[in-house]
Amino acid sequence: MLHAMRPVLLVAALLAVTAHAFLGFGSGSTHKDDAEWGHYHNQAQLEAKLGEINEKCPEITTLYEIGQSVEGRPLVVIQFSTTPGEHIPTKPEVKLIGNMHGNEPIGRELLLRFAETLCNGAINNDKEIVQLLNSTSIHILPSMNPDGFELALGTEPAQRQWLTGRSNINGVDLNRDFPDLDSIFYELQKIGVPKFDHLLSLFEDNVDRQPETIAVGQWTLSLPFVLSANFHEGDLVANYPFDAAIDENSQKTAYSASPDDGTFRWLAKSYADNHAHMSKNDHAPCDGTSQDAFARQGGITNGAKWYSVAGGMQDFNYLATNAMEITLELSCEKMPEGSQLPRFWEDNQKSIFEYVWKSHSGVKGMVVDAMTGEPIKRAVVWIRNGTETVPVKHPVTTWSEGDFYRVLPAGKYEIIVAAEGYDIAAKNVTVENKVRDSALVVNFALSPAADEPSENEQEQIAELVNEIARRR
């Protein structure tokens, strides 16, 4: 489990490649953009900018600190919502995280600029942004590793090595510091135990995790996040779970599909296709080899097929919570000159917006007691694709207010809901994803079960569990 968690405070060189592979092509930046966004914001400047945005848009933003770095720098989140600080049932929560590796700060700057764009759009009554903010709660953590960033920023570019500032100040790679839930998932598969989600309760080790990991881990567990993205550098590709190889030798690379492989591929492809270059054959592979020519495979990759990572954040999200997270590699070059940042914004702006909109795909709804109308928390929601005979081996659970969310591509599905003390309920639906600001709403009112389940009900439950267990 995540040890010593504190409560969330809510209130080196690469092979030569063509320049456009990591610099971007955009030519629409203005002199004002270059002055404002053509440099990296240090910690003090970042905090000041977030404060400025909050003051400019107080009705739709709130600032909160989820913890501190080893050296005491605050991990500050800015939330955008029509009800900042309050979760509204069936309104999806999205989080975006930058600068997990201190020497990979493009995401830090993109997220800071995304925050300002949301604020300015709301002020100017931009139709798309107003629609997005009316329907979505967006949490932005520009920097998860401010200590590493300050180290990298304070090192002369000529002296900066490939790993300078990557880890936190204790020398720990934060993307290897989360509980390794993949190993638990693979072991449960091997022995045939039908447990596929929320695996943190089964995890135990004696590792003293880093304060940045603890803060983000606790934050991830504190809200019903639906969708998440983690911004990195070192290549140009959208990476999706699983990150840890299913092979017993965790160092071996092998395609390791999650139960939601199709959905994750769809999410990653959405980002890559909306990016100026990620999915296009207009740039050389970052490492100069055909093996990692990601553009030829649509600008996406399964994490473990690329290289195996145990203790990564995106798999933690998937196996500990209801959230789906992908990792976005934005540049071959790490920490490029600040003057190039406006071009990166041009390359990624559409992708970021379209990715957040994906939180409104699939289905969502409420699960309540049919007799009292009271919400049922921790109800288990299974999804069966219409082309499959058994459910996806990864259910989601309802939040404390009875709401659930399931990101899905268009298709026909059966939704099966089970809760202790209630009869199982199921509905068949067609997901079209044609409504931009809302997933398909599918509500359930569960009837209380008899004191002793009938033989038929027991058989139904046993059959459902056995079918899921057999799908290995």
Curated annotation (Swiss-Prot):
Expression is restricted to the nervous system. Residues 39-359 form the Peptidase M14 domain. Binds 1 zinc ion per subunit. Its EC number is 3.4.17.10. Glycans are attached at N134, N385, N428. One of its GO terms (molecular function) is zinc ion binding. Residues 1-21 form the signal peptide. Belongs to the peptidase M14 family. This is Carboxypeptidase E. It comes from Caenorhabditis elegans.
